[in-house]
Amino acid sequence: NTLGGTSVRAAIAMSKIGYSSALHLVTMNHDVRRLLPPECEYICSAPEENSYPHLIIQFTQNHTIRVQDKIIRPKQANRIIYDNDLDNILMRLDPRLSQLLLNAKVFLISGFNAMQDQSLLEDRLEKLLISMENLPKDALVFYEDACFYNKDFSRIVRDKLLGHIQIFSLNEDEFEGYIGRKINLLDPLEVLQSLEILHELIPVPKIVLHTHYWALAYGQNADSLKKALKGGINMGGT
């Protein structure tokens, strides 16, 4: 067994190379406590313990998938995630988050893509921004994009957070979603032109784009992320 979610996977990876982290969780149970890195500090907003397992179906390129009388052969490896996770849908924020951020060097934001109520989403974002006032002035704020159930919610999150983040990170599926077409990821000129369009839509200091071929940083002083990108690729491939 293992734990999922962007922040938890990051904490597990960081622990393997000797870096500590602190997590804001929305679900807690015996398995979460058992599988978290022992040195990882955490808070949890859940009023009671629950278990919401996510079913993840991974498939390889050209794998034959039979769905009733149809056969599907995907052009690239990918995955499908099925879940019914009420804690993620509600995304309660623990008021102790403000205190947790006092000494943060890097703050990763992710997880709003599962929310389904606009008023709740706006409330959570307002509370998040209040907590972020406690961040040190030199803290790096990193936003990891995701596939939103409601595309309008993606825009709401961006509009609220764009002025507060230094790095906006996304994968190729999300990248193509913003550009509105398929992109040849092996054509450097097409990728660059598409990144220029994306940067106009999402004017942040740096964009990190990670694909199944490569990862890159685009924007102000992008070279400063070269070692981090290489480390992420090595970690993801081992």
Regions found by a protein language model. Name each.
Residues N1-T238:
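Ribokinase/PfkB-type carbohydrate-kinase core domain
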